[in-house]
Design a protein with these regions (language model features):
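Histidine-centered active-site/metal-ligand motif
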Residues: 197-200, 280-283
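Secretory targeting and sorting signals
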Residues: 1-17
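Short acidic alpha-helical/loop segments enriched in Asp/Glu that coordinate divalent cations
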Residues: 219-226, 238-247, 302-309
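Flexible internal linker/loop segments at domain or repeat junctions
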Residues: 236-277
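Active-site-proximal binding-pocket segments
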Residues: 219, 223, 281-292, 296-300
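Extracellular glycan-targeting catalytic surfaces
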Residues: 6, 17-196, 202, 206, ...
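Hydrophobic/aromatic side-chain positions at a characteristic register within alpha-helices
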Residues: 113-116, 212-216
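Amphipathic alpha-helical interface segments
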Residues: 207-211
Length: 385
């Protein structure tokens, strides 16, 4: 069903996505593998086979997706020229609409993959074409966050539709969608912001790497890898980092007081604590999801980020999954009060063998993982098992 594009990478390393060999970087002359944003052709085919065979947990996950508002044949996009997203709960314009429409396009693309029904491909194209004809910019204090959430989802949806046989996306509409991502999303998500909360930076990087693959943009891809490698060690603490956490490269976090404030008043550091644990666990979940998305997309392109980050990600997952499973926090952590839940963000890590019994227990208990209505969607379906 998929037109798979890409050259084989040479060199030593573990087997990667398909026949690619995993390395630290993508050679400048290497082609990108398509589809290859979060999900590969092989994963999409496995998903289809598991659903049509009635296997669990994929069947229930599929039915939940199909029956969601995003899966409706009658879904209607609501595009805006200027998506304005202010901070502090102020009224915006087009923010929820773009997030939901991007998720709907991705949902319809997955439905087409499973069913082969052209109505789903047509709906995904209709949504993406509506936005590419209208959107010019993101504005407001949360412009980069909005562009990150939606850019990552748009790239996933577009990648599947573009490289699915029979999806019928005209070349001129593909080019227009490329232009939208290049002009309305990429400038926002490519901008370095080392002093922000880490989930925002990782979400932006998630979008940047997905857009880079869709655009066959080596420079943006390489910059996303570098940004990821800077941010992850400064977000997910391990005992080996020393008494204090590492700080983001280029940040102004240069004193103990600033570090304490940046870590939301946490002053005791043990493996698994993250920069936002004492903010709330939901934002930790966003960072976990983005980290897994980036590593998964990189893997499909032959780049191994998992080996660099799995110890940090596993420690964070086990700590926060344990907190959620038990409902209690130790006194040393956030004064004994940790708020929120991780959300539907565990499946990719579990699929890659990252995390221990606490993480797997929570993943199995909360299946099927649905969507957070921001940028995470249907990962039991795509990566479960």
């Amino acid at each position: 069903m998929f037109v798979v594009v890409g050259l084989l990478l040479s060199g030593c390393g573990a087997a990667g996505s398909g026949n690619r060999t995993l390395a630290r970087a993508l050679p400048p002359d290497a082609e990108f593998t398509h589809p290859g944003v979060l999900v590969s052709a092989g994963q999409l085919e496995d998903m289809r086979k598991n659903v049509t065979a009635g296997k669990e947990p994929w069947l229930t996950a599929y039915l939940d997706m199909r029956d969601s508002k995003y899966g409706a044949y009658k879904y209607r996009a609501e595009p805006y020229e200027d998506v304005h997203c202010p901070a502090g709960g102020k009224a915006g314009q087009g923010c929820a609409q773009e997030r939901e429409d991007a998720l709907a396009a991705y949902t319809q693309a997955l439905l087409y993959t499973v069913t082969g029904k052209k109505q789903h491909a047509e709906k995904a194209r209709e949504i993406m074409d509506a936005w590419s004809a209208e959107l010019k910019r993101h504005s407001g204090e949360n412009a980069a966050l909005q562009a990150g959430w939606t850019g990552s989802t748009w790239a996933r949806a577009a990648e599947i539709v573009r490289y699915s046989e029979g999806a019928g996306w005209p070349a001129d509409r593909v080019r227009r969608f490329e232009s939208m991502l290049r002009t309305a999303h990429l400038p926002e998500v490519a901008r370095k912001v080392p002093d922000v909360n880490g989930d925002r930076d990782l979400v932006a990087t998630d979008a940047a790497i997905g857009i880079a693959v869709f655009l066959d943009d080596h420079d943006t891809f390489d910059k996303a890898l570098a940004r990821f490698r800077d941010r992850v060690p400064a977000y997910f603490y391990l005992d080996k980092d020393g008494r204090l956490p590492l700080t983001p490269a280029g940040s102004g976090i240069t004193t103990p007081q600033r570090l304490t404030s940046y870590w939301h008043r946490q002053t005791t550091f043990k493996s698994g604590v993250t920069q936002e644990t004492c903010r709330d666990v939901e934002h930790v979940g966003h960072a976990v999801a983005a980290t897994a998305h980036i590593a998964e997309t990189a893997r499909h392109q032959g780049v191994d980020l998992y080996s660099e980050t799995e110890d940090r990600l596993a420690a964070a997952l086990d700590l926060h999954a344990g907190l959620q499973n038990s409902g209690r926090a130790p006194a040393w952590l956030c004064g004994g009060e940790v708020e929120g839940k991780l959300g539907p963000v565990l499946e990719i890590a579990v699929h890659r063998g990252i995390g221990g019994p606490a993480t797997r227990k929570l993943a199995e208990r909360t299946r099927p993982a649905g969507t957070n209505d921001l940028f995470v969607a249907w990962e039991t379906l795509t990566h479960g098992g």
